[in-house]
Amino acid sequence: MLTLKLITEETERVIKGLEKKHFPEAKAAVEKAIAIDKQRREAQTKLDAILAESKKYAAQIGQLMKAGKKEEAEAAKAEVAKLKASAAELENVKANAEQELTAHLCTIPNIPYDEVPEGSCAEDNVVVKSSLRECKPGDTVGNWDTVPTNGEAKLPHWELAKKYNLIDFDLGVKITGAGFPVYIGKGAQLQRALINFFLAEANKAGYTEIMPPTVVNAASGYGTGQLPDKEGQMYHCEVDDLYLIPTAEVPVTNIYRDVILDEKDLPVKNCAYTQCFRREAGSYGKDVRGLNRLHEFSKIEIVRIDTPEHSKESHKEMLDHVEGLLKKLELPYRILRLCGGDQSFTSAICYDFEVYSEAQGRWLEVSSVSNFDTYQANRLKCRYRNADKKVQLCHTLNGSALALPRIVASILEDNQTAEGIRIPKALVPYTGFEMIN
């Protein structure tokens, strides 16, 4: 969440940032936070005065008793009792204000960096790089018309999966429901090969591998910002009050909740392979066909914790890492800098990676790489101690490297030939075969 210091000292900047994100009633939300904080501070000021007064009376009581002034001592005791009652009331007012303030701050999103483009929707996202051509200033999703084509009709991955017996969508419906496919034979082997390839590449890049739980408590969900913002999209086990994770970002980042790191140990670089679970309420049509949008899927996540001074450099390294994976998989891609209106609730800046599906005639998102500035760290109380022994909030960053479903779809669709489906060279050591036929 945003810090009170930022909200109170740079109020106009915060309001403008929230408006850039198209957050409704930005000014009212900020003013409410300031008003609640004022109530809290006023209660604290009154409480401090009462405690000081009570301390003064307490000191007098002993002196009066020694002097034999029992009546005056009893009167002082009565005053102390009144002050204690007033102090208890103020403690309650202050605690309620703090609780209300925290709850309210959790409903206010992060503010975007200056370099985040203006815009209200995906059409306004800026294309900053592509494997297809040089990008020009003004290139956006809305006006981008460059796509790969070889002039041959291509089958979509759901037809290829059936043709080569790789994925059974109907069997998944029988076992669980829509959005839970069953991978079979070389389809399962391809999935496992990608997981091993992505983890191996992350290890080479210096990431420490983590194997976290796939269920988390509410505190973890609040720490990274999925709660309360995305509660409706998460699977919740009410009996135990636990949530299935939508991404490894949640458990891996929460490792550092309520932790003070040493600056010399930064950046922290972790990666994790997990199953991810998302309700995806409201999705329909071509968005959910085949592997396009699932309720359960495999993903490798990279997570970094860094200092404010070095987080932009960390972000650049993460972007380069994800781009390198797409190059090795020989997939046509483009990189988008998301506009304010299309950014997530918690991010300060985000880049999406998309690969093109000729068979579907559309771009498919395969990764988002975000810098959250201090937004998550403030919720998590994730801090570091610098060389001067000063404790400060860290910056947190994460990204998909990569999410498997659409990568599998792209590999099947882009590499189909008359003889079968060609496996990208970088994957062959992991699959053990060069063709699916």
Predicted ranges, named:
Residues S131-N437:
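TRNA-recognition modules of translation machinery and tRNA-sensing kinases, especially anticodon-binding
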Residues M1-V141:
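N-terminal alpha-helical targeting/anchoring segments
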